[in-house]
Curated annotation (Swiss-Prot):
Protein name per UniProt: F-box only protein 34
Pfam families assigned to the protein according to its UniProt record, in alphabetical order: F-box
Protein purpose: Substrate-recognition component of the SCF (SKP1-CUL1-F-box protein)-type E3 ubiquitin ligase complex.
Source species taxonomy: Eukaryota, Metazoa, Chordata, Craniata, Vertebrata
Keyword tRNA-binding in record: no
């Protein structure tokens, strides 16, 4: 029984409310269009207040329900203009208390995601004398906080102007000091330097941080140039030994001062409209922070050690390439006899090793002719040119280290002469650095220019030479490399050192390469002769024993020479086990067995063509041409007669399966056709549903 529907009376203050009952009744098309137009007309004044809003001030559309903080607008009624902020707060609180009796208060503070926010949309237009018929920009402006998704772009012009001023200042400077403070101090100083700051109420952006860092670098430029003018080139070793404390370094390296300059020049040379390379500045800042951290904790290992070594490697390579051109004059002032000799590595150790005394190898001064080295070069010196009694202290060189220091108790005479010549030039150029004694070991390695490039790569030794060379023969193999007469030292030492330098540039293991041709003709002929005599030192018993073993391991080719008909006759006399072994070991025999269908002498497979396709009753396998599998040739003394068809042979009864003489799981198709004609009709009826017993 359905109730009769009646029209619901509506007030004039609620023109937008349409009950569910009215929706069920038939409505004309024009009335529906007018309702949509009316709804659109009431939603428009929420965006732009107009005269229609003043006329229908009592009507409250849906759009005015969201704000929590009220603000003044131009389209208010005179009653609303007379109210101040306190009156608004009183009305707001009164609305909250008034909602206890009827519907929930519309102007209560609605949190995001609260259910009251949905209810407030339907309960709003019942309170006609409520304030706030205007749209407020943000509904979350409580306690005077700034809007979440709005950015103040007014101060961006000030930042750009200040950034251009910093670029103009940096274009005039030539060097910059490493940054003393990190990013965490950047915002504090930047806010305190200027009175109000660029943006005093919010954190600084990356562009402002970069501008601040450039300003700091310019301010500290004068002190850096004073300290760096008189200091010589000191190459700082990135990875230091753990047990040895490093010596203090009073002067900063000029390579580190020149490196930011080389990176800032392309920045300042650009047009002022382009943005700053923030990645370059941040990478430079991180490298400097890590450098200062390494100076505070010199010997400690931290998680940033690998990153610190990589940053130091980049700084050293760039700085050494820049300082290489300015230091060519000091390198050319050496002895003219050393022009073909190129120094490969100049090592510097900040402390003296325990194996050596300070007085033997300590000189006051540093080298001015430090060549530019790639960061991935690792040098391994060959110790064959030294005496057996010499002690060698080596510092291991990894890929991240820039240089490797080698110290020797006694060097060859020609190398000592060159070291003394270079030390004279070194001490003349740097008299200021005599304050800190440094232990320097200079390894002079020479490379001959006209040497073929094929000898530079490491040659593979002959096979078997590792067992024939002993330690005594190794010392006799290079007698000419160590002993040279005094008058020939100036001439013959250069090709000799060329051979040593080529071996020093290569990475070598503990075993020494026996056939490394030297530059001198006398040494090369002696090495070739000694390498030829190494093969004659093997005993005759060893050669005879090895020949006998090789003869035993060689396959015998007698069977392969026989014709096929003879091989087939031989195979038919073999048992199944022997034939299966021959088939598995040789492909030639396998092809013969399968092609000629050779059966073993003790095979139990039925040769009758009627049962050729009949499978085994238990393993369900059919006979294949040349099949010698072990599961089909055992004798089956017992016959299992089935009532519905032919029986089959089996190796044992089910009760005898546990006996050791039983051949478990080995069956063939040699079955007995007992009562075959008698049980044919029964066999046809039960063929589809028969289940055979498996023993």
């Amino acid at each position: 029984m359905h109730l009769k529907l009646y029209w619901k009376l509506q007030k004039k203050e609620r023109p937008l409310e349409v009950s569910r009952d009215t929706l069920r009744t038939p409505m004309s098309h024009g009335k529906a269009n007018g309702d949509v137009k009316a709804r659109a007309s009431y939603m428009k004044p929420t965006v732009l207040p107009s005269a229609s809003l003043v006329k229908a001030s009592s009507r409250k559309p849906f759009g005015i329900l969201s704000p929590n903080v009220l603000c003044s607008m131009s389209g208010k009624s005179p009653v609303e203009n007379s109210l101040n902020v306190k009156a608004k707060k009183n009305v707001l609180s009164a609305a909250v208390h008034q909602s206890e009796e009827g519907l929930p208060g519309t102007w209560a503070i609605v949190k995001p995601g609260n259910t009251k926010e949905k209810i407030a949309f339907f309960a709003a237009h019942q309170y006609s004398n409520r304030i706030g018929s205007m749209k407020i920009k943000s509904s979350w402006d409580i306690d005077g906080r700034a809007t979440k998704r709005r950015k103040k772009s007014g101060d961006l012009k000030k930042a750009k102007l200040q950034l251009e001023m910093m670029r103009e200042i940096n274009s005039q400077c030539y060097q910059s000091e490493p940054f003393v403070c990190g990013v965490e101090h950047c915002s504090v100083h930047y806010m305190s330097d200027s009175g109000d700051g660029v943006c005093a109420a919010r954190p600084l952006s990356v562009i402002q941080m970069v501008a601040f860092l450039e300003q700091k670098a310019t301010a500290l430029l004068a002190s850096c140039t004073k300290n760096c003018t008189n200091s010589p080139a000191i190459v700082k070793i990135s990875g230091q030994s753990r047990g040895i404390p490093p010596a203090p370094e009073p002067f900063s390296a000029p390579e580190t001062c020149e490196e930011p300059k080389e990176q800032e020049n392309p920045e300042t040379g650009r047009s002022q409209g382009e943005p700053v390379r923030v990645l370059d500045m941040v990478a430079r800042l991180e490298s400097e922070c890590l450098k200062h951290q390494g100076q505070r904790e010199p010997g400690s290992l931290s998680r940033n050690n690998s990153f610190r070594r990589n940053v130091g490697r980049v700084l050293l390579t760039n700085g050494s390439q820049a300082s290489d051109k300015s230091e060519e004059g000091s390198a050319d002032t050496a002895d003219p006899q050393e022009n073909p000799l190129q120094p490969v590595s100049v090592g510097e150790e900040p402390s003296v090793t325990e194996h050596h005394s300070v007085g033997e190898q300590a000189w006051d001064g540093t080298s001015q002719s430090c060549p530019s080295l790639p960061a991935t070069v690792s040098f391994h010196m060959d110790s064959t040119d030294l005496e057996p009694g010499q002690q060698t202290a080596m510092k291991s060189c990894s890929r991240d280290d820039v240089e490797m220091v080698e110290e020797f108790d006694e060097l060859p005479t020609d190398a000592v002469r060159r070291i003394r010549r270079e030390l004279v030039t070194v001490t003349k150029h740097s008299p200021e650095q005599r304050q800190d004694p440094l232990c320097i070991s200079i390894t002079v390695c020479t490379v001959e220019k006209d040497r073929p490039a094929a000898l530079d790569s490491l040659e593979e030794p002959l096979p078997g030479m590792l067992f024939f060379l002993s330690s005594g023969q190794d010392q006799q193999a290079h007698p000419q490399l160590r002993e040279h007469p005094a008058p020939e030292a100036s001439e013959a030492s250069q090709p000799q050192d060329a051979a040593e330098g080529s071996s020093a540039g290569e990475e070598k293991d503990a075993s020494v390469e026996p056939l490394l041709p030297a530059a001198s003709p006398g040494g090369s002929t002696s090495q070739v002769l000694e390498a030829a005599t190494c093969k004659k030192q093997v005993s005759q018993d060893f050669l005879e024993t090895r020949f006998k073993i090789q003869q035993l391991l060689e396959p015998q080719q007698y069977m392969a020479c026989l014709p096929h008909h003879i091989i087939v006759k031989i195979f038919r006399l073999l048992p199944t086990l022997s034939l299966a072994i021959l088939k598995c070991t040789c492909r030639y025999f396998k092809s013969i067995i399968e092609y000629y269908n050779i059966r073993p002498a003790d095979s139990r497979w039925v040769r009758d063509p009627r049962y050729r396709e009949d499978p085994c009753k238990q393993c369900k396998k059919k006979y294949v041409k040349g099949d010698v599998s072990l599961c089909r040739w055992h004798p089956k003394p017992y016959c299992q007669a089935l009532p519905y068809g032919p029986g089959y042979w089996m190796c044992c009864h089910q009760s005898q399966k546990g006996f050791p003489g039983c051949k478990l799981g080995l069956h063939d198709n040699h079955w007995l056709p007992a009562c075959h004609s008698f049980n044919r009709a029964i066999h046809k009826k039960t063929r589809g549903s028969e289940t055979e017993e498996e023993y």
